[in-house]
């Protein structure tokens, strides 16, 4: 095990704030579980990540690259659906691997990720590269559940061509230490990328979330939307960046991070960042964190709800629009897991 630094800000601030990056006790994953594909028609083994894939750190990226590599190519004018399941097992508790996705012109893919397992002290390190050619469309639903006392390193990089669209929705509900590093490059004009994440962190869970989208093509559009709840002694840090590069005139970007702290022992840090070298653009950022409004809780309790039920209603009202963006096949599972994790009557 070694100490590394992960998720470094693209434009650093004062060192005494201790938010430019995060320290992490990192251990390379061991015996690897298998990735199971629901459909192997477009899947082949092997592949190489691009040289400019950074990842959360050099160490975490190297760990993913030491595992198995897979390449998924969706041909031109093809619509496909694919589910990738990775389950920690007793004899193979860890996972390391790389995934390269290429959607050719006018291709469409509905992709579902499932990471799960009851095995304690697992370590997952993944690196995924998504390349979307002209007018390609990719919808991703990413679900993590279970994996108690485990470390999860999710790293991804997306490059979008003209009029390409990427909608990435993740439910960060598993693991004890979750590190997400997502970088998007809107290289094509009229390209669109939406990064949505919901979470329900409980116990000693720690979330380190990094999202960065570069606007390069003209009239590109980006959204970063993160919402969730923290209970017990959970903590979360959000680093979100929208970078408007010279030449991306007419582009629009919005980012927001919203956290409900159900306990005074929780900790939340939010760093929404806007960078710009182009005049004709629109960029907005926002963050909100705090405990529940007791007037709202009182109102719900006067209508017959218990304190626990009232708290869950407020949290669900915040994250339900994000859940509805997930693939329909996983929505009820996500909602049930959120309720289970935040139900204080079970603790």
What is the role of each PLM region?
Residues 1-28, 85, 120, 143, ...:
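A generic "cationic amphipathic patch" detector
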Residues 21-23, 33, 44, 49, ...:
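Residue-level detector of solvent-exposed, low-hydrophobicity positions
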Residues 55-298, 302-305, 327-347:
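Conserved beta-strand/loop scaffold segments within soluble protein domains that form the structured core
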Residues 297-320:
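Extended amphipathic alpha-helical segments enriched in small hydrophobics
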């Amino acid at each position: 095990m070694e100490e590394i630094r992960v998720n470094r800000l693209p434009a650093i601030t004062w060192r005494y704030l201790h938010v430019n990056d995060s320290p992490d006790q990192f251990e390379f994953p061991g015996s690897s579980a298998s990735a199971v594909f629901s459909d192997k028609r477009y899947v082949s083994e092997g592949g190489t990540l691009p040289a400019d894939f950074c990842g959360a750190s050099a160490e975490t990226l190297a760990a993913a690259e030491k595992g198995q590599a897979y390449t998924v190519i969706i041909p031109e004018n093809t619509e496909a659906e694919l589910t990738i399941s990775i389950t920690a097992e007793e004899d193979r508790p860890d996972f390391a691997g790389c995934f390269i996705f290429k959607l050719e012109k006018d291709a469409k893919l509905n992709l579902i990720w499932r990471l799960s397992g009851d095995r304690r002290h697992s370590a997952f390190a993944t690196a995924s590269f998504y390349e979307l050619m002209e007018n390609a469309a990719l919808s991703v639903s990413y679900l993590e559940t279970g994996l108690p006392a485990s470390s999860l390193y999710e790293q991804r990089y997306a490059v979008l061509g003209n009029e390409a669209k990427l909608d990435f929705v993740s439910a960060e509900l598993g693991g004890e230490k979750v590190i997400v590093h997502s970088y998007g490059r809107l290289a094509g004009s009229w390209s669109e990328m939406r990064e949505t994440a919901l979470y329900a962190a409980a116990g000693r869970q720690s979330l380190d979330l990094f999202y960065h989208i570069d606007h390069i093509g003209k009239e590109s559009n980006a959204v970063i939307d993160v919402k969730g709840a923290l209970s017990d002694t959970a903590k979360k840090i959000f680093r979100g960046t929208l970078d408007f590069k010279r030449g991306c005139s007419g582009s629009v970007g919005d980012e927001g991070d919203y956290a409900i702290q159900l306990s005074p022992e929780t900790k939340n840090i939010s760093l929404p960042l806007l960078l710009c070298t182009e005049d004709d653009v629109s960029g907005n950022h926002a963050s909100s964190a705090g405990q529940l409004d007791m007037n709202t809780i009182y109102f719900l309790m006067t209508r017959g709800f218990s304190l626990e039920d009232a708290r869950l209603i407020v949290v669900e009202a915040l994250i339900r629009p994000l859940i509805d963006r997930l693939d329909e096949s996983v929505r009820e599972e996500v909602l049930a897991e959120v309720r289970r994790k935040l139900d204080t009557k079970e603790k």
